[in-house]
């Protein structure tokens, strides 16, 4: 495959690494795990790399994740907003919590779901202890972050902030069609070409 420098490099690493490298060559990034700092660092790096390689072509983010760290997810979100490229998103299997947030944060008109994907929206929560002062500080931070996420989801879905806040107080599950109606996505995917980046390149040595 060719890297951002145009130098042809042989595949190395495990089969999973080879698949990830092949998809990255097609401008496809996969979020297929819980969102943590390590996953966020990898995805942010991939977004920045693909943007540097071509700042005009779309990048696709495929999501099958139960969610995870809010700070890690916001790092991915901010990187998606930072780069000039449109980032299309696709829900596969499960887009839960932070996975749902990143799904709805895709470029308008380019947010997709497979027909039987499940999408979960809820407010973040965490167990914490310590002194009364520590608990109060942490609770205040959790409330501020929760308010931020609700505002951003409302912005990306077109729903009133009050409705998003109310709907996310408890687990709110969506089918693909329900997510479409709510504004979390723009299309239920029928053809792979609908979500494949226009700048995707055919891999040398890989048969169709």
State where each predicted segment sits.
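N-terminal organellar transit peptides
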Residues: 1-98, 105-208
